[in-house]
Amino acid sequence: MGIKHLYQVIAENAPDAIKAGDIKNHFGRKVAIDASMSIYSFLIAVRSEGQQLMSDTGETTSHLMGMFYRTLRMVDNGIKPLYVFDGAPPKLKSGELAKRSARKHEATEAHEEAKETGTAEDVEKFSRRTVRVTREHNAECKKLLKLMGIPYIDAPTEAEAQCAVLARAGKVYAAASEDMDTLCFEAPILLRHLTFSEQRKEPIQEIHLNRALEGLGMDRNQFIDLCILLGCDYLEPIPKVGPNTALKLIRDHGTLEKVVESIEKDPKQKYVIPESWPYQDARELFLNPDVRDANDPECDFKWEAPDIEGLVDFLVKDKGFNEDRVRNGAARLQKNLKTAQQSRLEGFFKPVAKTDAEKATLKRKHDEKIQEQKKRKKEEAKAKKEAKARPRAAV
């Protein structure tokens, strides 16, 4: 699910944080990709009649079709992908996962009913809601990646958090996922739509965390608190708190502790905090996720030549893919993985670390900006109060 409305909040308040461009702009870059999110997107790319792509034996092949051709598209454009798979979910996420499972069960029943009585749109809508990524899907995709010569690693828990670690360490240029919570895990750059099909003609969104924080006038802790208020995978949102309200609450109070205190003291009880709402635990999962250090041997990876005959055996003989297309794709992989070895010019220059004085100046400017925002809001509130207090002119 990610963070509800976060893209909208950043687009409206920190537009400089978002760049949209063509996939070829990322030539020569290494990118860590959230594998589970990608596989899910491949599985919901169903045909209009709501059916998954199937082999002759009735096995689902949508995930393999998507993984093979979308990865091929990236490599064709000079990108070197690394896939990161989810490990066990954090305990705090189990409640949300249970709710999702219940929703999928309801959707399955609704899907069956729609097939009998509903429209084509109903069938497709409920079909998408029944989709879930299984261990078998993951295992088959890992087998495919190995045969393609594309590296993958397993994260201890959340794949997005591990992608963020690799991006911060400079082992990859960016983390790629549709989940906006990748930014909460401190990924410096998030790429979205990278694994979308070419037919969708969606530009690649490149979101820079530092620019988002600057535009929002927040530090990382406040940004995480904002994301929890917006609604994340770990907690249900506070009813009636939408994106504008969430942003105002954090700007007015600074921390979730003070937001909660303000809500609980409000005599009007405009908002009601859910009975069990362990926001501090959710914050801790974003600040200190269970991840491997970027220098851990488990995080070593390299790109290798594809096993062409192995791909033919697996995709053509086992899964019923077209042999000419598979061989053609494997040949492109072999050729373009070598081309992707070429370095971008920016790779020759390492960013210079900021001095303590520069960091202090940035912090001072940030604090001044926050104070200025608070002062302006107080003045606006005072002006409104005075306007209300003025006697109305006689008609």
Curated annotation (Swiss-Prot):
PTM characteristics: Phosphorylated. Phosphorylation upon DNA damage induces relocalization to the nuclear plasma.
Keywords annotated in UniProt: DNA damage, DNA repair, DNA replication, Endonuclease, Exonuclease, Hydrolase, Magnesium, Metal-binding, Mitochondrion, Nuclease, Nucleus, Phosphoprotein
Residue ranges of the region described as I-domain: 122-253
CC cofactor: Mg(2+)
InterPro entries cross-referenced by the UniProt entry: 5-3_exonuclease_C_sf, Flap_endonuc, HhH2, PIN-like_dom_sf, XPG-I_dom, XPG/Rad2, XPG_CS, XPG_DNA_repair_N
N-domain, as annotated region: 1-104
Sequence ranges of Basic and acidic residues compositional bias: 357-389
EC number of this enzyme: 3.1.-.-
GO cellular component terms, A-Z: cytoplasm; mitochondrion; nucleolus; nucleoplasm; nucleus
Region spans: Disordered: 96-122, 357-395
The UniProt record lists the keyword GTP-binding: no
Binding site for Mg(2+) 2: D179, D181, D233
SUPFAM superfamilies cross-referenced by the UniProt entry: 5' to 3' exonuclease, C-terminal subdomain, PIN domain-like
GO biological process: base-excision repair; DNA replication, removal of RNA primer
Cofactor: binding comment: Binds 2 magnesium ions per subunit. They probably participate in the reaction catalyzed by the enzyme. May bind an additional third magnesium ion after substrate binding.
Source species, domain of life: Eukaryota
Compartment(s) of residence: Nucleus, Nucleolus; Nucleus, Nucleoplasm; Mitochondrion
Protein residues bound to Mg(2+) 1: D34, D86, E158, E160
Principal subcellular localisation of the protein: nucleus
Record-linked SMART domains: HhH2, XPGI, XPGN
One GO MF term attached to the UniProt entry: magnesium ion binding
Region Interaction with PCNA, residue ranges: 341-349
Subunit (UniProt): Interacts with PCNA. Three molecules of fen1 bind to one PCNA trimer with each molecule binding to one PCNA monomer. PCNA stimulates the nuclease activity without altering cleavage specificity.
UniProt-listed PANTHER family: FLAP ENDONUCLEASE 1 (PTHR11081:SF9), FLAP ENDONUCLEASE FAMILY MEMBER (PTHR11081)
Recorded family membership: Belongs to the XPG/RAD2 endonuclease family. FEN1 subfamily.
Designated name of the protein: Flap endonuclease 1
Organism: Emericella nidulans (strain FGSC A4 / ATCC 38163 / CBS 112.46 / NRRL 194 / M139)
Gene: fen1
